[in-house]
Amino acid sequence: MSTQILATSFKNDNIHKIVRPTTNYHPSIWGDRFLHYDIPKEELNYKQGQVEELKEVVRKEIFGEFLCDDWSNRLKLIDVVQRLGLSYHFESEIQNELQHIYNKISINDSNFEHETLHDASIRFRLLRQHGYRVSLDIFDKFKDENGNFKECLASDTVGLLSLYEASHLSCVGENLLDEALSFTTKHLTEFLENNKKEHPNDDPLSKEISRALERPLRKTLVNLHARYFISIYEKDASHNKVLLQLAKLDFNLLQSMHKKELSEISRWWKELDSAHNFPFARNRIVELYIWILGVYYEPQYSFARNILVKIIALSSIADDIYDSYGIFEEHKLLIEAIDRWDKNCMDKLHPEYLQKYYKILLQSFEEFEQEFEKEETYKVYYGKETFKRLLRGYFEEARWLNEGYMPSLEEHLKVSLVTSGYFMLMACSLVGMKSNNIVTKQVFEWLSKDPKIVRASASVCRYMDDVAGHKNEQERNHIPSTIECYMKQYGVSEEEACDEMNRRVVIAWKEINEEFLKPTEAASPILVRALNLARVMDLLYKNGDNYTQVGKVTKDSVAVLLIDPIP
């Protein structure tokens, strides 16, 4: 809801009354709930010891030599391990298994000539996920003489569900997988409609299909899906008891660790006194933690998460300064100070909220630098430069609004892909990563050229954000969105423009998939950050802006990941 408020501005020692357009964002719905949490070190060590013991049992049982020739069962077990959120424990074992299977294809594809649709789809999906260029020929046996998928497959519901999931690993130009998506979506939807009449309380398969149609595996946060899948796997009579026990212990252990992280970040946020210093800004530190937990949930990235949550919180305040509170003269003062990045600029910043923001920003990055050895401070430098670039983008958009300028879509995207924040978040996600020399200066230089996978992830963010927020933005004076630019440039309706943005999201996902196929420009742990950033958008913006207006999706995600342990 838009309102007008009075504010004061300082210029030439004169006080002027200013009418600000601003948006009334609802306060944090969590209060101080996550402010205090601790887990005794003895308890933490005990739980970690349990996990380590079970890992060794699983390593022998699941990845033992006795499974070496049972490729179908091996793939299904790998799939289960991934769905349970445990793959980060067994990365080398999974990679070795998949390499072995891929080599078998290269030597003699007839090894797989009798596989079912379910098996073929799992094989395709898992190999593609791990960067192997698997041919679409794998699905030829399931097509009729006219090149269409055989109608008899409509009765193979499990196979259809697997093919549906596999179709989301498509790249640009792979029409067969587009056909597979349409074919499976049609028949899975029909299955749900027919099954409702026979099983009104929903059977497990129907629940799994409903969830997949809403959020396919490729677009799902790993840790969020793990909680859901644990409850499904537990009801499977053939489940591996040790694997299930490990999944439960690991999930609860991670949840405890994440709650401790959030309590520390919440105290940092409270010390900033954001609600008082920046009352116009969205108070969403819990939601931002969920955002970054989607980027990486694994325990080895705790340090990186701490840095990235603070950076995204600072960028969210800046977004609200430029988008919904500050006036253009203030925007200019702030960006000039940001470009100089010098404490001596402080006295030139008025009103006081700009000084406070600038001081917090500079202090935060100084504190980040202090966490690194001298030879690694370059990481913070690159993060700082991408943050500056983000705010320059905010300023350019503010200039459009101030001048009443409507850019072309192409001109808009040169700026708005930057202001999506994803170029900045991608670079800053690597600042705190400690991954065996994977993150180097060369990687940051590669990122500075806006590689295709990062542009694609930023595109998912930009288009989904604009579609989700378009209607609410009409209630106030606002920066033109991609939707409005497209409508004006091509003379189309709002609905047609939204359809085009959604179509571009589909293409961006295909580009992300393509960039994972070997040989890749960067190591997998780096590429996964771009993928996960896109996944967060699918969670929070698929059905409206669940960050600005915290809705059921966000509340449920917080409850699952940070409140409710697995019994």
UniProtKB/Swiss-Prot annotation:
Mg(2+) 2 binds at D319, D323. It is an enzyme of class 4 (lyase). It catalyses: (2E,6E)-farnesyl diphosphate = alpha-humulene + diphosphate; (2E,6E)-farnesyl diphosphate = (+)-valencene + diphosphate; (2E)-geranyl diphosphate = beta-myrcene + diphosphate; (2E,6E)-farnesyl diphosphate = allo-aromadendrene + diphosphate. Mg(2+) 1 binds at D319, D323. GO terms for molecular function: magnesium ion binding; terpene synthase activity. Pathway: Secondary metabolite biosynthesis; terpenoid biosynthesis. Pfam families: Terpene_synth, Terpene_synth_C. Its cofactor is Mg(2+); Mn(2+). PANTHER family: (-)-GERMACRENE D SYNTHASE, OS04G0344100 PROTEIN-RELATED. The Asp-Asp-Xaa-Xaa-Asp/Glu (DDXXD/E) motif is important for the catalytic activity, presumably through binding to Mg(2+). Belongs to the terpene synthase family. Tpsb subfamily. This is Allo-aromadendrene synthase TPS4FN. It comes from Cannabis sativa.
